[in-house]
Amino acid sequence: MSRMYETIYIVQPDLGDEEIKALSTKVQDVIASMNGDFKRVEDWGTRKLAYPINKNPRGRYFYLRFDGDSGLIAELERRLRLDDKVIRYQSVKLETEVVAPAAAPVKSAEEGTEEVAAEAATEAPAETTTTVEG
């Protein structure tokens, strides 16, 4: 049974473009060879880690979203674990398809200001002042 998964993996920040491309291709080949279907692949770039991992204060993040079965996850995580360039990885099963929220409809300038003023009047907290004598 095919399920939706997300995987984020972090690689060493000092890798060259060729090494990163080769690693990314290898990861995508594992998913494709096990009949996985890519939904999204993103390179989030180099970011500061919350704490140093293997003496690296930074890491380059990659995000994958794909369909596959549990055997695919086991094989993907095995390959990521064996690769010395990968310093961390995490895979999670998504319960449902995640859909980005729709943008709010654009209102005309007159409608928007009237509604904002009405909302501000109803949502404004009551001001209270207390005097402390000492």
UniProtKB/Swiss-Prot annotation:
**What Gene3D superfamilies does the entry give?**
3.30.70.60
The cellular component terms of Gene Ontology attached to this UniProt record, alphabetical and capped at eight, are: cytosolic small ribosomal subunit
Renumbered to this chain, the Low complexity biased-composition regions fall at: 118-134
Which GO BP annotation is one of this protein's? translation
InterPro entries from the entry?
Ribosomal_bS6, Ribosomal_bS6_sf, Ribosomal_S6_plastid/chlpt, Transl_elong_EF1B/ribsomal_bS6
List the Pfam families hit by this protein, alphabetically: Ribosomal_S6 (PF01250)
Give the matching CDD domains: bS6 (cd00473)
Q: Which GO terms describe its molecular function?
A: small ribosomal subunit rRNA binding; structural constituent of ribosome
Region of interest called Disordered, as start-end residue ranges on this chain: 103-134
Q: Which UniProt keywords apply?
A: Ribonucleoprotein, Ribosomal protein, RNA-binding, rRNA-binding
Keyword Ribonucleoprotein attached: yes
The protein's job, in short, is: Binds together with bS18 to 16S ribosomal RNA.
Q: Which family does it belong to?
A: Belongs to the bacterial ribosomal protein bS6 family.
Q: What is the protein name given in its UniProt record?
A: Small ribosomal subunit protein bS6
Organism the protein comes from: Citrifermentans bemidjiense (strain ATCC BAA-1014 / DSM 16622 / JCM 12645 / Bem) (Geobacter bemidjiensis)
Q: Which gene encodes it?
A: rpsF
